[in-house]
Structures are given as structure tokens and as C-alpha cells.
Amino acid sequence: MSTNQKTIVIVDDEKAYADFLTAMLTETFGCPVRTFHRATDALAELAGVNAGIVITDYHMPQMTGLVFIQRASKIAPGVPFVLVTGNSFHCDDHAVGPDLPLRAILTKPFSWRKLADEILRHAPDLALKPGRAVGMASPDTPA
């Protein structure tokens, strides 16, 4: 594995859900996936991770996903973020701020294809594993 290889980072306090995402992303993409169940742990270690994209939950016990993104973007400038939430969520440019690297908001349940498309759109250097297509096994598998 190349030391320059980008990593997909997942930050979600729901262990079963985060582990499911990790398994699906590992199976689909040809890059490492790093999972954190606590936002503070992710912040402490993010500088040492060559992140290609960060997927974070909105509702977490220590801080919201938006607060996490604000802090993490200072540690890992230029890395895109995808926010995942179980509730309908709306934020405009004023709530998020023009400098926040939030690239997409996905409301659970969303299709696996939608998440993979967002990853490929905002982190095009993260490649699918050879022979894999987005949603190859089940394109509408809820994530």
C-alpha cells in the first residue's frame, strides 16, 4: 500500500452503522477506510491520516457534525466532508458558512449508490476497486 494513498474517514457514534459503512466502503473502494466512534478521537488523530474525504454523522454526543467539520477542517484543510443525518436537515450558506468544506448532506436512509456517487464526485482520486461498479451488488441498498 502506498503511503500517499488517500483514506476514507468515517465519524459516527453508532458503532453498528459505522461498521456497516466501513465494510461497504472497504468492499467497494480500493483505499483504506478509517472509522472513529467519537468525534474527539477523530480530531486527535486526523492530522496523521491522509484523508481523501470524511463522512460524519450530524447527531453525536460530544459535538454536532457541523462543529466537528469546523474543527476538523482546520486540522485537514482542503478535505471534503459529507454530513449524514437521521433527521431531515436543512442548512443554508449562512448557517454553514462559505468556508466550511461541507460538500453534501445525506438523510438516512439513503441509497448506497448515492453515497458512493458523492464520494467519487468530491474525492475523485479515490478509485473503485478494479472490476467494481457503484452499486454493483445492490444499487439501492440503504446505507
Predicted regions and their residues:
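Acidic, metal-coordinating helix/loop segments flanking the phosphotransfer/catalytic sites
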Residues: T35-I53
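C-terminal output helix
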Residues: F110-A123, A127, G131
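Receiver (REC) domain active-site loop signature in two-component systems and cognate sites
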Residues: M60
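Alpha4 helix (beta4-alpha4-beta5 surface) of REC/receiver domains from two-component response regulators
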Residues: V67, S88-I105, R113, D117
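Acidic catalytic/metal-coordinating carboxylates
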Residues: H37-R38, T64-V67
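Two-component/phosphorelay signaling modules centered on CheY-like receiver
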Residues: K15-R34
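Active-site residues of response regulator receiver
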Residues: D57, T85
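CheY-like receiver
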Residues: L126-A143
